[in-house]
UniProtKB/Swiss-Prot annotation:
GO terms for cellular component: cytosol; succinate-CoA ligase complex. Mg(2+) binds at N209, D223. This is Succinate--CoA ligase [ADP-forming] subunit beta. Belongs to the succinate/malate CoA ligase beta subunit family. Keywords: ATP-binding, Ligase, Magnesium, Metal-binding, Nucleotide-binding, Tricarboxylic acid cycle. Pathway: Carbohydrate metabolism; tricarboxylic acid cycle; succinate from succinyl-CoA (ligase route): step 1/1.
Length: 397
């Protein structure tokens, strides 16, 4: 689960991180009062969407030379003018795709005198099975580009969970970020604070980009991105309350109600599979034969008829889907249950696109019999390769 920047900063402020004063607003009429609560004379007006690249983004409704989704204002009047121009419009960034995201919230923040911009994040390093800091002196940039072009400028430092952030870890992080004086002293406090927030709140990512050194030599969290482990949300009611479903795909929200692992993609072949590995293999083979998957959908090992029906409805709700591939290997999951669910869903929502079904495993003969006797126009497949070829051919024809 993702949250907005202003929510992430409020959370980190609660742990003692150095965060600038700021006020979130939902209407342009709130802009003046919000700005008056801040010291000034510089203000930053920030679009709040769940996507990066806001500063370089463009609003669909504005002229191409209009400013992006993060704007500097030198007066309260400028804050108000920017708020009126940004709220309600659609911001397109490198992460939103061409459809963009509507800006329904702004964060008015006190400006900062920046001396240096740094990069810092904490994530789970799966190669060692530990939380790890990733830091670089190249802040405010796309860290993936830095990793590709100048990997020597990035330090990845795994943290032993039983010890937490040690003095030695702090020394290494300060050295990698070239911090000294007051900034290094701030680092001694900040690094353990961020690690504590990451672990206590079950985050999957905590990214500060940039972490800045101000002209007075002190550190400040200038931007913050936080993602949480969905599997741990039951422990954090306070975090769940921060969820903004307007930023999420409606189909993914519906899938979560049925405990379905669903991720919307940009292709035109819908997939319903059991098991994450088989689901990824199914998407790969669709791409191998020249098409693109419209989604990742894992119905799991113990899906009921109702769950399968819900999954099928979610797939068919995507207007981009031109064909559907059901690929089931029945271990715990029974093929007859899948067959009954698919038939129930087709009868309820109708079938306007080609449907290829490949079943194998537990009760496979019964599953195939149920489908063959259903009277539905379903294309059977013998194996995964055969299924992929048939659905791609059906969609292209």
């Amino acid at each position: 689960m993702n949250i907005h920047e202003y929510q992430a900063k409020e959370l980190l402020r609660g742990y003692g991180a150095p965060v600038a004063q700021g006020v979130a607003i939902f209407t342009s009429g709130e802009a003046e009062a919000a700005a008056k609560k801040l010291p000034g004379p510089l203000y930053v007006v920030k679009s709040q969407i769940h996507a990066g690249g806001r500063g370089k983004g463009k609003f669909k409704e504005l002229s191409p030379d209009a400013k992006g989704g993060v704007r500097l204002a030198k007066s309260i009047e400028e804050v108000v003018a920017n708020a009126k121009e940004m709220l309600g419009n659609t911001l397109v960034t490198k992460q939103t795709g061409p459809e963009g995201k509507q800006v329904n919230r702004l964060y008015i923040e006190d400006g900062a005198d920046i001396a240096r911009e740094l990069y810092l994040s904490i994530l789970i390093d799966r190669t060692v099975g530990r939380p790890a800091f990733v830091v670089s002196t190249e802040g405010g940039m796309d860290i993936e580009a830095v990793a590709e072009e100048t990997p020597e400028k990035i330090l990845t430092l795994a943290i032993a969970p039983e010890r937490g952030v040690t003095n030695d870890d702090v020394t290494k992080l300060n050295a990698a970020l070239k911090l000294d004086g007051a900034a290094a002293k701030d680092g001694e406090t900040l690094f353990p604070i961020l690690y504590k927030a990451f672990t206590e709140k079950d985050m999957s990512l905590l990214e500060v980009n940039p972490l800045i050194v101000m002209q007075n030599g002190r550190l400040r969290v200038l931007d913050a991105k936080v993602s949480f482990d969905n599997n741990a949300l039951f422990r954090h009611e306070d975090v769940v309350e921060l969820r903004d479903t307007s930023e999420e795909d409606e189909k993914e929200i519906e899938a979560s109600k049925y405990d379905l692992a669903y991720v919307a993609l940009d292709g035109d072949i819908g997939c319903m599979v059991n098991g994450a590995g088989l689901a990824m293999a199914t998407m790969d083979i669709i791409k191998l034969y020249g098409a693109e998957p419209a989604n990742f959908l894992d119905v799991g090992g113990g899906a009921s008829k109702e769950k399968v029906t819900a999954a099928f409805k979610i797939i068919t709700a995507d207007p981009n889907v031109k064909g559907i591939l059901v690929n089931i290997f029945g271990g715990i999951m029974r093929c007859d249950v899948i067959a009954e669910g698919v038939i129930a869903a087709v009868k309820e929502v109708g079938l306007k696109v080609p449907l290829v079904v490949r079943l194998e495993g537990t009760n496979v003969d019964l599953g195939k019999k149920i489908i063959s006797q259903s009277g539905l126009n379903v294309i059977p497949a013998d194996d995964l390769d055969d299924a992929a070829k048939k659905i791609v051919a059906a969609v292209k024809s």
